[in-house]
Amino acid sequence: VVKAGFNELRLVWKDIKSRLVVRRYIASYFMFNMAVQTVMIMATAFANKEIVGIKTQDLIVSILLIQFLGILGSVVFSKIATRFGNRLGLSIAILIWIGLCLFVYFFVFLPWQFYIAASMVGLVMGGIQSLARSTYSKMLPETEDHASYFSFFDVSEKIGLAIGTISFGLIETFTDIRTSVLALVVFFVAGIILLLRVPIK
């Protein structure tokens, strides 16, 4: 079963390599989603190390804010994409993520500031996740086996998460966790540059 799964993913990758638009989009998604997933995984560690006086209930409130505002964010970015196109919607989301990393690095030291950051994460998280998948779905070939293509999409997400988390940890080891957050900007910038090379609306 495992071997069959790998063979299926290999065939999907072979097909994707022959499709310029999909290949470029996957590269862009890999970069910006690597940073997005790393933020979600490492947010609690950052709060515990860097936020003065933060308590468990503060983290719970932050998680609730992210979940609630994520719904709103998906609606807002869906409207943006409908009016201006998916690429612009994704570009706006990535730019907000870049701004968020800079905001956290320079200004987030207290619980109420962390709440603001969590609210921003929620809004842009819901938007970028829904737009990323819908954009990918529009690029897929006419086939009944879309599940294999989305399996490949999900695998790239998991690989990106692993690389992002390792990179975050290495940077923290040699500097500090706040610098690790700032370094995520590199992934977002790479993601938006690659996205602008994708010939889609």
Regions found by a protein language model. Name each.
Residues V1-I26:
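Juxtamembrane intracellular "pre-TM" segments in multi-pass secondary transporters
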Residues I41-D58:
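Short amphipathic helix-loop junctions that connect adjacent transmembrane helices
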Residues L72-N86, E172:
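Helix-to-loop junctions at the C-terminal end of transmembrane segments
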Residues L88-F103:
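Structural signature of the two symmetry-related core transmembrane helices
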Residues Y105-A117:
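Helix-loop junctions at membrane interfaces in 12-TM secondary transporters
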Residues G127-P141:
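Intracellular juxtamembrane helix-capping segments at the cytosolic ends
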Residues L170-F188:
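A membrane-interface helix-boundary motif in multi-pass transporters
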Residues L182-K201:
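Multi-pass alpha-helical transporter architecture, strongest
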